[in-house]
């Protein structure tokens, strides 16, 4: 039987001219000149609208597309197929199983709803609604979706996946999109873009990256993960940059590095990093003003480079640090072997140190400055500090009435200070030391004495509060649950 370019064969057919309806049974085959083939057990064909209803082991084939379903409605004028009782579509290496589906055969676009499962040699996908564009070989995800590939597990509330290019884009509406890669890296963000072929990713909007093995967490508004070479990391290129994983974070960056002891908290506006190896900690640096907290140390600087694996830290641009009651300032700093019990601080440029006090007339006990300095630490606590070149020291002495009574001023070529329990214990002066003594009442303007190295407790408190505020601005978005195990998929 032929009608409007359609050819049908079957074992039995009933024609109704009044209803313009053809009912066919028994191995029904429908053929069209463009290559469309539909096989079924039964067919109701409304010839006026060229609509056909197939039932019983329906099989549709056109080119490399095939569909199997218990029942199918085919609308010939729109060249559209629809099923609502479950079906399986195959297109090349893609296999899609769903509760309902619609195929737009002219455009080779297929829409699926209900419980949708996509199988591919390189991925498995579960969702509640998606659209497959066969010509572009891409999936548009229109509902919460979970994708499992060789690289990891990914979930978002919407997005798309380019199968040939192996690129995934996920975004969130109410819950964060997330990824678990290589069973150790956890990424959460408002939007997540992953290139599995290049092994790179971008996360934007309340972004979080966590290495559960190294125990490192990085928060930012935007995160990018790629090889150190493609990121163009500066100021240093790692050896074999193509195979070294790199990170680039921008916007309200907060880093927690617990990979080695002591742990480090770091706050800045942009940061770059790379991994020397899969076992080593990050090498991180920034050219933005930053605040860093390591054990009892609180530091700020304009630039900062830290290598946790080697225990090395370098800071430049008005470096300031606090430990206990002591405050230090310099143009820059090299801190070597900070992970060891014994370590050294090498200060760059004019250096000052001051020590807070808890009484009047001034909230300062000791101030000193020199042209350069170095310090020795034991258990990461200030043990000895040496100032060199035009050293000036101011020391307030306590009187018998428990008030500050006098000011000692000492000038020398070199001064060495010994500390105990994070407070000054002894001072030694070399190179023609000269000293003066003034009662407090004769000091004209004590507030201006060594202004550049006066303690700034308000700044310290403000920096500590900014660290707390930065931490509070990044609430948990599901990381705790992911670390305990992937949540069950709700179908």
Predicted feature residues:
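Mature-chain termini and adjacent capping regions
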Residues: 1-491
